[in-house]
């Protein structure tokens, strides 16, 4: 199963992520966002940030998840490449760790700055093989 793919969107970037579980799909959504920013294959998982979030539905939880990761990029220049998550769909909570390192011009390619997550075209679909998440980020 592929992790994520990009799709055409006027002036922004559309991302479709996949996962056998909801946690894997959320992780791949985050990986897709950071792939817009840099080559995630060069991001070493040397530091982590613990993340605890709750939402009013799964789409809101995804929105908060991506925004939280972008907050760490904006405030600490943290870029991430590995995620360990647990999502409770009954209480609509996410808890986990995002692993990565601080952006370093000598190691990491500077691609496009992702300004924010959006609700535009945001959907989370359960399929026979797992989950498909579709969303757009503002660049």
Curated annotation (Swiss-Prot):
Keyword Metal-binding in annotation: yes
Q: Which domain of life is it from?
A: Archaea
Presence of keyword tRNA processing:
yes
Entry binding sites for Ca(2+): 12, 138-139
> Which stretches are annotated as coiled coil?
none
Q: Which InterPro entries match?
A: Archease (IPR002804), Archease_arc (IPR022952), Archease_dom (IPR023572), Archease_dom_sf (IPR036820)
> Per UniProt, what is one Pfam family of this protein?
Archease
Keywords on record: Calcium, Metal-binding, tRNA processing
What GO MF annotations does this protein's record show?
A: calcium ion binding
Q: What's one GO BP annotation on this UniProt entry? A: tRNA splicing, via endonucleolytic cleavage and ligation
Role, per record: Activates the tRNA-splicing ligase complex by facilitating the enzymatic turnover of catalytic subunit RtcB. Acts by promoting the guanylylation of RtcB, a key intermediate step in tRNA ligation. Can also alter the NTP specificity of RtcB such that ATP, dGTP or ITP is used efficiently.
HAMAP family per the UniProt record, alphabetical: Archease_arch
Q: Which family does it belong to?
A: Belongs to the archease family.
Please state what the protein is called.
Answer: Protein archease
**Natural source organism:** Saccharolobus solfataricus (strain ATCC 35092 / DSM 1617 / JCM 11322 / P2) (Sulfolobus solfataricus)
């Amino acid at each position: 199963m592929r992790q994520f793919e990009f799709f055409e969107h006027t002036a922004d970037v559309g991302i479709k992520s996949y996962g056998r579980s909801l946690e894997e799909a959320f992780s791949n959504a985050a990986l897709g966002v950071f792939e817009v920013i840099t080559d995630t294959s060069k991001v070493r998982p040397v530091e982590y940030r613990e993340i605890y979030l709750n939402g009013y539905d799964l789409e809101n939880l995804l929105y908060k998840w991506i925004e939280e990761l972008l907050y760490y990029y904006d405030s600490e220049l943290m870029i991430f490449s590995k995620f360990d998550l647990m999502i409770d769909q009954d209480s609509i909570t996410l808890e986990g760790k995002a692993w990565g390192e601080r952006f370093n011009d000598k190691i990491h390619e500077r691609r496009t700055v992702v300004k924010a997550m959006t609700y535009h075209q945001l959907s989370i679909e359960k399929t026979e093989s797992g989950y498909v998440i579709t969303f757009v980020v503002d660049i």
